[in-house]
């Protein structure tokens, strides 16, 4: 099965009084429950979400934590707090950037489900300069292969291609 989005590069940034919102929408040819599991179960998240290997734990309740501990040469721990959880349709959690948070909304449709991801940031320009749109794009590009049982590794060449595309749109910094 495969996914289809309105465009292969469909990330957008909306500037708001509070900073901004990065948005993605994916139409996935998988049942909502499978997609929910892929965004909430540690072993599934590890297959597609991060650009590095990590041990992930998820306490899937409001106030619970999602903890990602890098297992590579550079130690790093990212802890997010779960703000809202309404299985299998809504997950909202903080992000590593203070004051920002992410909202995952799933909608069941006849052909699978629609995933709407919104990343609320405090500074849209900083998010653009730090290539948040590109990182989200690349993570989401790995979701369908994961759902198909064929996870793919992070591809830095694909990241560079997406970065060049989004930079032309003013939604990412240019590669240096």
Predicted regions and their residues:
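Short, highly charged C-terminal tails/helix-capping segments
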Residues: 145-176
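Beta-strand/loop substructures that line and gate deep hydrophobic ligand-binding cavities in soluble
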Residues: 92-145
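Hydrophobic ligand-binding cavity/cleft-lining segments
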Residues: 1-55
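Hydrophobic/aromatic beta-strand elements that line small-molecule binding cavities or substrate pockets
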Residues: 26, 79-84, 101-108
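Glycine-centered tight beta-turn/hairpin loop motif at sheet-sheet or coil-to-beta transitions
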Residues: 19, 73-75, 97-99
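Short, exposed beta-strand/loop patches in secreted or surface proteins that constitute
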Residues: 13-15, 57-59, 81-84, 106
